[in-house]
Amino acid sequence: MIIATTDTIAGKEITKTLGMARGSTIQAKHLGKDIMSGLRSVVGGELTEYSKMLEEAREKAINRMVEDAEKMGADAVVNVRFMTSMVMAGAAEILAYGTAVKIMNR
């Protein structure tokens, strides 16, 4: 499965648009990691616990988007975007979405 943030793929022609593919996950903070991040935010520096959590969440959302596109029979997903929203205190949703398409070589 080709995943692209652009609306075209070099060397490929989009032959059919299948619809929006999407995948999401909701991640909550871990109390122990939250305390460490709180301390780090006071003294400065990267909040590595949150960076890792968000990286894992993005990967889960991408994988779920790909599964959704595969169900539609897609060869690729173009115009891929991410969106983050707070769903409750201490929890965030990561949404990956794009256009599922059929492609062929030029």
UniProtKB/Swiss-Prot annotation:
InterPro entries linked: UPF0145_dom_sf, UPF0145_YbjQ-like
Stored SUPFAM superfamilies: YbjQ-like
According to the UniProt entry, the coiled-coil residues are none
Q: Which family does it belong to?
A: Belongs to the UPF0145 family.
- Can you name this protein? UPF0145 protein MA_3383
